[in-house]
From Swiss-Prot:
It catalyses: dTDP-beta-L-rhamnose + L-arginyl-[protein] = N(omega)-(alpha-L-rhamnosyl)-L-arginyl-[protein] + dTDP + H(+). Keywords: Glycosyltransferase, Transferase. This is Protein-arginine rhamnosyltransferase. Protein-arginine rhamnosyltransferase that catalyzes the transfer of a single rhamnose to elongation factor P (EF-P) on 'Lys-32', a modification required for EF-P-dependent rescue of polyproline stalled ribosomes.
Amino acid sequence: MSTSSNASHWDIFCTVVDNYGDIGVTWRLAKQLVNEYHIPIILWVDDLNSFSHILPTLNPKLVSQCFNGVIINHWTTPLAVPYLPGKVLIEAFACELPDEVKLQLATLHKTAPQAVPLWLNLEYLSAEDWVDGCHGLPSMQVSGIKKYFYFPGFTPKTGGLICERELFAERDAWQQDPANKLQLFESLGLKDIQAQDSVFSIFSYETDSLPALCELWQARAKNDAKIHALLPKGRSLNSLQHLLPCPVDALMPGQQIKLGDLTLHILPMTDQQGFDRLLWSCDVNIVRGEDSFLRAQWAAKPFIWHIYPQEDDYHLIKLEAFIRLYCDNLAPDIADTWSKLNFAFSQGQQSAVKTHWQNLNPVSLPLLQHAKEWPIDAINAADLATRLVQFVKKS
């Protein structure tokens, strides 16, 4: 494959840290920049095996390939594909650029400073107040080049949120016809799910909260509509090993585990469009990393955010900041219980999780209505790609 470049292209470098979160965000951004702004994008990724789980047609053995108009290069050490400076250089989530790239930038700065790309560090999404003041700030590097911090966020003063131009219209059209979700479940090999059943998707880290919820759902399912929990192989299922008939690694996509009237369904991996549609089709979504966290919000369905645990419980500060924003227009009693449910889930508090789930009834109409209204409030008139393009033009 040709790796020729021109001065107008953008490079995005991404290291895969949490299997799918980081690459999920950068892959969506790369596709949107190509599709909506016709910007040539080269995406450098260090772990193509993980990437292939959300892009099944990707060949992890190739050093360079193209999908959706995006050139995908395998980020090797040293680089197997030469880096050719373009207009913009994006470090996703503070990844460390390859030495040969930094050396090339330093040389360019000395010999042809006008050819140095605009260098951006795409940061993690946060709802904390300090993000407004830090977005767009420059940091002088040893080479003498400025690197700018680009912070996604929920306010007009931040870098915005990744959201494709037609996403909400596609979601609304999908959700208007119940047949769509049933056809999706069938295509994923998920059997015996009826339109009136309660369906929950689970994409969390390991946690004691999941066995607690499964215990609750088993008991409730005897008196209510059947409950289906949809889980991919991986970290969520590890928490339920004691309920499974075999080791997690031995489970197959489409397999069912019946626990009374609660049924666990093993999900196959799917591409990003399939994942979006899955979230659109479930009554409640339990999500984790940045990509699934944001897509659960765009799904306009109630959700629980299992935030990535950090030292000194800093993740709980980030969780509180988001909950404060999300609950701003929510009735105080529902906001209080939804907040407590999220905190209890992220801390593995089994008794509290069951109590707050029962108190909240997450598929209740007020919370569902709020979930439908939230995406319009959160987008704040402009998405991340739009703001990013504007930022580059102004810089």
